[in-house]
Amino acid sequence: MITPQQAIERLISNNELFYDEMTDLMRQIMRGQVLPEQIAAILTGLRIKVETVSEITAAAAVMREFATKVPLENAEGLVDIVGTGGDGAKTFNISTTSMFVAAAAGAKVAKHGGRSVSSSSGAADVVEQMGANLNLTPEQVAQSIRQTGIGFMFAPNHHSAMRHVAPVRRSLGFRSIFNILGPLTNPAGAPNQLLGVFHTDLCGILSRVLQQLGSKHVLVVCGEGGLDEITLTGKTRVAELKDGKISEYDIRPEDFGIETRRNLDEIKVANTQESLLKMNEVLEGREGAARDIVLLNTAAALYAGNVAASLSDGISAAREAIDSGRAKSKKEEFVGFQPQQRCHFLGKMELG
């Protein structure tokens, strides 16, 4: 067992923590057994030293261990569409829009997200703005996935142990290991993922982490300029985990017959209301940059979720899902989802 003080000493000496040590330390943090000042020192030490694949893997495994899970009989076909945030791009909610298009094209989407930290609109903000219920129980999220093909998991509802860390993170004011742990800890256990990151170095790192955590088919992407999505403005770095192996390559919009844009101004928004408006325009079939970036990211989600055989096939499926009106209908179905209620008779008989 490693004590918090021993961990701090190791980190300030620029030495990494071994997997078992990081596991033990993270469990202590999640149980509330580490002082806030010590957590701050640990997060600072990890950031300065730079977190290793082993340290991130251990921390993510413990967060999964402590998470309130979504009870699904079979999570094999699930895909998560998520980003680390932190890119400062102020774009509309691309991955959330892609969630509806992907589900309309046949994917089972288990999306994990929270409120805005650095963006104009977080995934949870826009889901709430459209009228959906953020506070479903884990059982109700599972119902939603079975019934609509989409489950949205509001991160604070599934990671209550993070209450021991949240005040420290806010007070530090810089990115820490926890900024990349959230997307690695899907409570529904989705084995397939489109994961956007804010730096190209993280593509290789997080693909290796997810490999060690047992993920099946993952695309970790970083758009030119640090966008945590597949971008329209140039190349996107991709690290793909498939069949246990990792390959890295670059893609560009023109590879798929999509116009490269000079900038992202057309898809920037100031707040959640503007983001929802942009989302609705895409789902209603309006042409433009917003539609194009959703096509690219939906294609990657469909490919990661093994619904499409390739990114090119994914583009075609995404386009058809929008143009047929099915993507718009899928959003309405998700927002209108009403969980089945169990009936209790005299506190003894349960029907349902």
Swiss-Prot record:
Residues binding 5-phospho-alpha-D-ribose 1-diphosphate: 83, 86-87, 91, 93-96, 111-119, 123
Binding site for anthranilate 1: G83
GO terms of molecular function: anthranilate phosphoribosyltransferase activity; magnesium ion binding
Biological pathway: Amino-acid biosynthesis; L-tryptophan biosynthesis; L-tryptophan from chorismate: step 2/5
EC identifiers of the protein: 2.4.2.18
UniProt xrefs under InterPro entries: Anthranilate_Pribosyl_Tfrase, Glycosyl_Trfase_fam3, Glycosyl_Trfase_fam3_N_dom, Glycosyl_Trfase_fam3_N_dom_sf, Nuc_phospho_transferase
Residues where anthranilate 2 binds: R169
Binding site for Mg(2+) 2: D228, E229
GO process terms (BP): L-tryptophan biosynthetic process
Obligatory cofactor(s): Mg(2+)
Top-rank taxon, per record: Bacteria
Keywords: Amino-acid biosynthesis, Aromatic amino acid biosynthesis, Glycosyltransferase, Magnesium, Metal-binding, Transferase, Tryptophan biosynthesis
Positions contributing to Mg(2+) 1 binding: S95, E229
Reaction(s) catalysed (UniProt annotation): N-(5-phospho-beta-D-ribosyl)anthranilate + diphosphate = 5-phospho-alpha-D-ribose 1-diphosphate + anthranilate
Any Pfam family matching the protein: Glycos_trans_3N
One CC-aspect GO term: cytosol
Cofactor note: Binds 2 magnesium ions per monomer.
NCBIfam families: trpD (TIGR01245)
Subunit relationships: Homodimer.
Function as written in the Swiss-Prot or TrEMBL entry: Catalyzes the transfer of the phosphoribosyl group of 5-phosphorylribose-1-pyrophosphate (PRPP) to anthranilate to yield N-(5'-phosphoribosyl)-anthranilate (PRA).
Matching HAMAP family: TrpD
Family membership noted in the UniProt record: Belongs to the anthranilate phosphoribosyltransferase family.
Protein's name according to its UniProt entry: Anthranilate phosphoribosyltransferase
Native source species: Neisseria meningitidis serogroup B (strain ATCC BAA-335 / MC58)
Name of the gene encoding the protein in the UniProt record: trpD
